[in-house]
Amino acid sequence: GTNETFSSHSEKDYTLSILTAGDGTGAQGDLVSLSGKIAGAGTSSITVTDDTIFGASAKVKLVATILKTSVIQKNKTTKLMKQLKVTSGTTDAYGTRPTDNTISLGRADVFNLVAVFDSEGASTDAIAPEFTVTNQSGTFTRGEKITGATSGATARIINIASPISYILSTSISFVAGETITGESSGASGTIGTLTDGSINITNSYLFDSGQRDNFYDIARLVRKPHSPAPTGRLLVIYDYFEHGAGDMFTVDSYVDIANQMDYEDIPTYSATKVDPETASPAGQFQLRDTYDFRSKVEDIAGTSSILTTIDEITGNSFDFFSRQYDGTGASISDFCKPGSTIQSDLEYYLGKRAAIV
């Protein structure tokens, strides 16, 4: 590819296996040493020659180390307040029914669980609380924080037009007739009629973002031990990242939306495996201080990239076959050779105090 050259030969950097034997001495499955058989190392293409082993018509697989320059940064687009409806009877796939111990969110790299509502009725959809708005000035931003001028209540909004659905951030509730103001947009309006939502059962679940040591898996909710199963349909609301094209994620991959992804909001990853002989890091990785080469699995059937569309998962999420990397939402990255060196430029702020005389 562009800005890629093959490294000089060493046995640990080149692995060639025979997939289909030709008329040479090599058999299917053989691993072939390439010492003295490579021409073109240091360039963008190489030629491997061994007529004795390969003969004619052999098919082989080569895994090689390359040097890549001018690496392209991948972006993570912040998506706020995505809604997922979980109903019974739609599919037999595990993770798609309210009573399943594990609920699939249908996509990877979810960074925040906002709320889970239970309708308490098998034939009724769960809903978030909402209010009508009058005298609106400006346009609210999806996912932003709003504050009530009279009550002091704060919440994050789901939709931006009346009636506005919201998730309270405090134990204080809004009151009719008060003015609300958006923190990010500066939009304002007057609350009219308030409508209660379904029962909030967020505390019944543990949240799994789907991050793994070497890839981004499907995010999920795991019902806590001794928590009762829901009696109705569920509405799950969460924030997630959409992955762009490129080679790796850095601190600059994260873009703020509605004051919900500032520098301090960039997630931390807790490793599933920790080397006890390594003093640092101790299994905690601040992604704002990390080169992240992990690939992301594709979205599960029933998801939509349109943020305002309510998802309803219909496919299998947790079996090995469902971890595909070539469909909608998937993101592939070439991984680095262990122990290799990464060279990059960085900018940082150096504080200084000085006296003016």
Q: What residues fall within each predicted segment?
A:
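Subunit-assembly interface segments of extracellular/virion macromolecular structures
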Residues: 1-357
